[in-house]
Amino acid sequence: MGKIKIGINGFGRIGRLVARVALQSDDVELVAVNDPFITTEYMTYMFKYDTVHGHWKHSDIKLKDDKTLLFGEKPVTVFGVRNPEEIPWGEAGADYVVESTGVFTDKDKAAAHLKGGAKKVVISAPSKDAPMFVVGVNEDKYTSDVNIVSNASCTTNCLAPLAKVINDNFGIIEGLMTTVHAITATQKTVDGPSSKDWRGGRAASFNIIPSSTGAAKAVGKVLPELNGKLTGMSFRVPTVDVSVVDLTVRTEKAASYDDIKKAIKAASEGKLKGIMGYVEEDLVSTDFVGDSRSSIFDAKAGIALNDHFVKLVSWYDNEWGYSNRVVDLIRHMAKTQ
């Protein structure tokens, strides 16, 4: 199999990091990027310098012309088209398109990319109607006739592997999740208008902001056996990257906290290696910046009330870990063709 050729629509946080992942991969080739709101020159600057993930050090990046970026000797075509139907992905050779604008998240809107010659589209956000896949949890349910998929959310990617391990080993009766989540681009630097979510309009770097999240309910879509058993909420906190899931569950089978730790450790070294992590050191959020795993279980942070009721804590780099999974999902789809 030749290299998997991908295009990226939307060069925001996830778009740029998916590009970084692709450019460091031997089996994936970034061939095109579309963003109507930034110039090619500005694109090179935004890609090269990153407050959280640091300078790009893997190759020189320069402008060949206003339609081409050069990463070392590797040319990447740049488009600035607003209407996804009109982006000529086919001409650029992009078979897989990462839809990371945050705008075209439903099936019909994302399908517009197919008209420009893309063969498959991966939405880097939850979708109300496109099938959602979480690598390590349900990607084996993907079939090659499906052209539009969602990689779910970063929080679902952290929660679902953890919930799967607990449910497979001990059974989950019910559970509540809280994610303590780093700020994202949708928030405000100072208090501003946010008519749908009043709290969300308050200054991100100065407040702990309670918020809603569909991440726990979405686990029921990727793990149908947990449908209706989990729900959750979010606190947005003033850090720029890395979030943490707190999952509190009642289990069917009696299990000590040690039993649970052993099951998660075994999964992290076995089937879920590279997806699930396990740490016993006294770590804090910045220690996970740049961690490519979806969910890193913090063995010391969790606590059990009794053998049926337990609180579990798992970290995730909500930018880098998630962007790695987007590329992993594309790899899996390519293998399935």
Swiss-Prot record:
Residues where D-glyceraldehyde 3-phosphate binds: 153-155, 184, 213-214, 236
UniProt GO cellular component terms: cytosol
Molecular function per GO: glyceraldehyde-3-phosphate dehydrogenase (NAD+) (phosphorylating) activity; NAD binding; NADP binding
Record: active site: 154 (nucleophile)
Pfam families assigned to the protein according to its UniProt record, in alphabetical order: Gp_dh_C, Gp_dh_N
Record's keyword annotation contains Nuclease: no
Predominant localisation class: cytoplasm
Residues that hold NAD(+) according to the record: 13-14, 35, 82, 318
Catalytic activity: D-glyceraldehyde 3-phosphate + phosphate + NAD(+) = (2R)-3-phospho-glyceroyl phosphate + NADH + H(+)
Function: Key enzyme in glycolysis that catalyzes the first step of the pathway by converting D-glyceraldehyde 3-phosphate (G3P) into 3-phospho-D-glyceroyl phosphate. Essential for the maintenance of cellular ATP levels and carbohydrate metabolism.
Entry's family note: Belongs to the glyceraldehyde-3-phosphate dehydrogenase family.
Protein name (record): Glyceraldehyde-3-phosphate dehydrogenase 1, cytosolic
Chain's gene name: GAPC
